[in-house]
Amino acid sequence: AASDVYKRQILTRVAKSHLRVGTFEYFASRQQWEDLKLLADFAIQRHFPKIRETDNHYLELLKKVASNQSILIANWMSVGFIHGVMNTDNFTISGETIDYGPCAFLDEYHPGKVFSSIDQNGRYAYGNQPSISSWNLASLAGCLIAFIDKDSDKANELATEVLENYSVDTNQRILDLMCMKIGLDGSKKNNQEILRNLLKLMMDNESDFTITFRSLSDILLNNSDNFLAQFHQKDEVSGWINNWKSALNLENKNVCLLYTSPSPRDRTT
């Protein structure tokens, strides 16, 4: 009846701000330089007030955004999160996840996985997220370039260095977090190769991303059934397990604790 009372609830997520790269592009595209400078100053005041004391706080703004986004993207990748619509309007200055969707977490592992029906060419596919974030950051750099240095060549040189460092740092962060999922140190080349071999096996066997990594801990408890169930190439996987165990012996860590501690809830912002 119309007079009946039903309990309902609303989940609201509040961001530190809704400033995005697209906000900067809006003013830059109209050559509204004074307004763009005011926006940059507000972003600094809102998110990074300490950099106002630096000699080149617009360059530092770019560096801070790069650092925050690098951490965010690496965490996305490590838990199999696909944002879905990574255009500049959804790329925050604060380094938070907003306006995601159609978003999802990976089921069967594949770098080209998309969940958005409008993303026909896979621009925002899981494996493309680091490069798309770099593209978005370059767009922000283009908006700030006139404020970074009056000498355009010098400004471009400084911005390019930030972008190059971003790509290197992000790729290493992804390796570190992904290697952590298998109990290994991501800075070691051999461990990186072991990770890549596992991901190749997962792709070829259409293995579930989360279940595969989670079931690795069972192997250390002498139960490999859950892990092996994710693969039909049993011989290749058995060889990988042997290589992985050899690498683990060199790490000398409490690997079971590492496996059970990280979770998507704790590691995405």
Q: Could you tell me what each predicted segment is?
A:
Residues 88:
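Catalytic-loop Lys-Pro-X-Asn motif of eukaryotic-like protein kinases
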Residues 4-83, 94-181, 185-188:
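ATP-dependent phospho-/nucleotidyl transfer catalytic cores
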